[in-house]
Amino acid sequence: MNYTLFVGDLHLSADRPDILNAFHQFLDQDASHCDALYILGDLFEVWVGDDIAEPFALELAERLKRFSTHTPIYFIHGNRDFLLGKEYAKRSGMTLLPEIYSIDLYGEPSVLLHGDSLCTLDKAYQRFRRFRNMAWAKFIYNHLPKSKRIAIADKLRSKSKQSNQIKSYSIMDVEQSAVEQLMAETGAKRMIHGHTHRPDIHRLANDTQRIVVGDWYEQGSVLKISPKEVNLQSLPFGETEA
């Protein structure tokens, strides 16, 4: 049976070998089955540049490259790995997609994105997001010394954690009006995203739906879509049969 897999928010790092092993196992078990694998951002906990890839990321690139020889891999940047560039993508066999991407998924018009752009009530974050996406800002950052880039990334992560602790639940979730606007603009019947770490299948008006792929902190989360079914799965680490 044909099917496509979607994952996101793995937040891979050397500090969590259990997540790394679970994702490696997931790739190995499903390599010969799915039509395509879409990674919807935040594959890594942090990414400060293709030239500073850690050993675990280089090993993952080799695994992804092998996977891509028979199954296409598509990647949309998240808020943690928005600096992942063409060099690492090529090394991994991944195709970089724009931050909002429309596809025909077995006859169903769908729109894919990481999801942070939908959290429009978080004004401070949206201001930072606009700044960090500017070409000149990326250019300057990428030309800083490696030590400076790492220091900036560490400071931003720390500030983000502190800020999120005091933000309300609603501010950190997507805004319904932003969802409706994007669905209307793209003509999509289905929206698929991550970012919020709140996996669910939301039934919307006019027979549309919004699917949120979960994170991989305590267990895996995989969305499996075939011509006949939509299945959002939780995968306990060590059990990765999608």
UniProtKB/Swiss-Prot annotation:
EC numbers for this chain: 3.6.1.54
Catalytic activity: UDP-2-N,3-O-bis[(3R)-3-hydroxytetradecanoyl]-alpha-D-glucosamine + H2O = 2-N,3-O-bis[(3R)-3-hydroxytetradecanoyl]-alpha-D-glucosaminyl 1-phosphate + UMP + 2 H(+)
Pathway: Glycolipid biosynthesis; lipid IV(A) biosynthesis; lipid IV(A) from (3R)-3-hydroxytetradecanoyl-[acyl-carrier-protein] and UDP-N-acetyl-alpha-D-glucosamine: step 4/6
Subcellular location: Cell inner membrane
Pfam families xref list: Metallophos
Cofactor(s) needed for function: Mn(2+)
Free-text remark on how the cofactor is bound: Binds 2 Mn(2+) ions per subunit in a binuclear metal center.
Binding-site residues for substrate, renumbered to this chain: N79, R80, D122, S160, N164, K167, H195
Transmembrane domains' residue ranges: none
Keywords: Cell inner membrane, Cell membrane, Hydrolase, Lipid A biosynthesis, Lipid biosynthesis, Lipid metabolism, Manganese, Membrane, Metal-binding
Keyword Magnesium carried by entry: no
Cited function: Hydrolyzes the pyrophosphate bond of UDP-2,3-diacylglucosamine to yield 2,3-diacylglucosamine 1-phosphate (lipid X) and UMP by catalyzing the attack of water at the alpha-P atom. Involved in the biosynthesis of lipid A, a phosphorylated glycolipid that anchors the lipopolysaccharide to the outer membrane of the cell.
HAMAP family the UniProt entry points to: LpxH
Protein name, as recorded: UDP-2,3-diacylglucosamine hydrolase
UniProt gene name: lpxH
